[in-house]
Structure formats: C-alpha cells, structure tokens
A protein has these predicted regions:
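Flavin-dependent oxidoreductase catalytic cores
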Residues: 1-182
Length: 182
C-alpha cells in the first residue's frame, strides 16, 4: 500500500515539515510500502502546478498561455526538499512528485538518492505515451507546459490538454475573462 503525504501545509498553524517527516516515520512503522511526498493545501491558495514550474516565459508565449506569461516562475521539482528530508529518515521507498518537467531532473532525483521513484500526473494528460518516449530516448522538457488548465476544468469538461488548438485556448481565455473559471 502506498500513500500520498502532504509533508508541509505552508499555513500558519498547519503541518510543519518536521511533523510531516514524523508522520512519514509513523506510517512506515505501521507497514506502509511507499510514500509519495507532496505539500501545500488548498486553503493557502497553493494549487499544485499553478505556479507553472519549470516552464519559461518564452515557452508560455509560444504556447499562447497569456494568463501566465508574467507569473512568477517556480523552480522545477517544487517538493524535492520535503522529499529529501523524508528520504533521509525512512527506509521504505519514497516517491517524488510536483513539477518534474525534464527527463534529466527525473533521473537526477533517482540517481541522487532524493527519491526511489518519480510520479507524474499532468504530463500524462498531454503525453499519454510519455514513458515509452523516454524509453526510446526522449530528453529535455516534457510537452506539458504546467499551465494547469486541465485541472481548472476538472469536472466541467472531459480530461484533456487544452494546449492542442488555438480554439481551445480561446475558449479557456474567454471562460477566465467572463469569470466562468477561477
């Protein structure tokens, strides 16, 4: 059995990293087989890939992601410090997740001992065959731009990547402009 653990809340009075690490140790003692490390909570406004980890402004402009061109960039792999801290204290496999957008970073996370595995979510929405591409030699940045539009429409439209056509991007921009998407 695996568990996804929010190791840090980023909120006043919320879970501290030390408490998160202690929780991971307790889960291991209970017999958990692996722990995926995440952080943040919706109450703080921290919304996963919303900061657009690992995607340059140039790429945002090329992909017509106008709503994020001036967004403050966040380094790729935004939960790696939390993951590293848990990895240091547990023996069960640890899984890194959160804004991993280059094959080289994914490899360095494993080779560097930060985690035993990496977990991806949004990149598979854009590239369902991503693992096969990496096996065949794909290097560099994955096609997912971390725009988070797929997440923003969760429950409103079928799961899809919205960076496929200009029409989809215009629909997204209109929904944001008219307040139909927050």
């Amino acid at each position: 059995m695996t568990i996804k653990l929010g190791a840090l809340d980023f909120a006043a009075g919320g879970l501290s990293l030390e408490e998160g690490v202690a929780t991971a140790e307790g889960l291991e003692r209970m017999g958990i087989n692996a722990i995926e490390i995440s952080s943040g909570c919706s109450e703080t406004g921290w919304a996963g890939a919303w900061p657009y980890a690992g995607v340059s402004r140039k790429r945002a402009l090329e992909d017509k992601l106008f709503h994020r061109i001036f967004a403050k960039p966040v380094p790729e792999g935004h939960f790696l410090e939390e993951t590293r801290r848990v990895r240091e204290r547990v023996k069960c496999p640890v899984i890194a997740v959160g804004g991993l957008r280059t094959v080289e970073t994914m490899e360095s996370v494993i080779k560097g001992g930060i985690a035993d595995f990496v977990s991806l979510n949004r990149p598979f929405v854009r590239e369902p065959d991503l693992v096969r591409k990496i096996e065949r030699g794909k290097r560099g940045v994955v096609d997912c731009t971390s725009c988070n539009i797929c997440s923003g429409y969760a429950g409103l439209h079928g799961l899809q990547c919205w960076i496929k056509t200009n029409k989809d991007l215009l629909i997204h921009a209109w929904c944001r402009f008219t307040g139909q998407l927050h």
